[in-house]
Amino acid sequence: MVKCEVTVHQQLIDFIRDTYATSDFIPLHAPTFAGNEKAYLADTIDSTFVSSVGKFVDEFEVKVREFTNTGRAVATVNGTAALHAALHLAGVRTGDLVITQALTFVATCNALHHMGARPVFVDIEPDAYGLCPVATATWLAEHAELDNAGVCRHINSGAAIKALMPMHTFGHPARLDELMALCQQWNLCLIEDAAESLGSFYKGRHTGTLGRFGALSFNGNKVITTGGGGMLLCQDAEDGARAKHVTTTAKVPHPYEFYHDEPGFNYRMPNLNAALGCAQMERLNTILASKRQLAARYADFFQSTDYRFIKEPAYARSNYWLNAVLCPNVESRNALLEITNARGVMIRPVWQLMHRLPMFADALRGDLAHSEWAEAHLVNLPSSPTEA
């Protein structure tokens, strides 16, 4: 068995090196710049509009809005800022609770922490690794009630439960129909952490557009990048106008006066970053096609092994942001991580579960059996587009 696993590990290394046609270090996900990035950056520098006012910021918002078919897209400095603003606009405040998943990147929880809110960790479902509707329904039935005003409250503490925040893990859409039904039943706001899922669709609708708010990320390791950046997607026109206002320091428009009508955030994306984003959006469909081809190759490679490649759920079309595979046991996972990284091929474990981090160790949580199993068995594979 050990010999067989070692053989698979070496075959995987060879497969990945052949795929990327290099003997150099292979990162997990690198950006590709093969279009108008340099030209648009030069244009921005020549214009002197390098901060949050400039034509590329507006153009980037339009491109993302049209691609996702959302009501309004508001560009922010990063995905965490988009989440933070979404929580603020949803009325989440100090002492409130937000239901989310423990299997996520820490930014999900950091955003609600900085609102003064606390996470409630519920298990993932074992197919797409997003927030499980059944586990969420069970937790709510056991621990929540609606008060006379229709506010969802935690029975033991009386704290208001304000929102449900699923994350579309590795780009695979969560089960949104069921989660939306729970939000309606319990008077919760659905905020989609779509940081990883630009180009992913749930039953034909882009992720981040089914909830009241959605948040995208354009970090350097995402499907497209602005260097650093995010986008707050709003379905409602009034929400969109409020999002633009509060992320622009709540400044009231005026030709020369500086007047701010509420505490706001300095979260607007700079024009330099948006210039990158506009160029990247021009190649988004090519990038997505390349990533789906890569995922198909990985699926074919692992088909005859004891490792299970994670495919998109039947109800969705995934961007396959980070390809992932489940190892047969913890020992094989650890060996795979050690061997591949020692030989210059970056394979990484999934994030440590949020309730294991010191700042969230005391958070309320349900049974996290699927999350803990995934943590012990799942690894991510190099996922840079190969033909973009």
PLM features: what roles do these ranges have?
Residues 1-50, 381-382:
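N-terminal "arm"/small-domain region of PLP-dependent enzymes with the aminotransferase-like
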Residues 41, 64, 82, 98, ...:
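Generic structural signal for small/hydrophobic residues in well-ordered secondary structure
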Residues 115, 185-186, 343:
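Helix C-cap/helix->beta junction micro-motif
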Residues 127-226, 231-233, 238, 380:
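Active-site phosphate-binding strand-loop segment of PLP-dependent enzymes
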Residues 15-16, 56-62, 70-71, 145-159, ...:
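PLP-dependent aminotransferase class I/II
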Residues 50-97, 103, 111-114, 121-123, ...:
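Phosphate-binding glycine-rich loop
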Residues 118-128, 348:
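Short beta-strand->loop structural element characteristic of the AMP-binding/adenylate-forming
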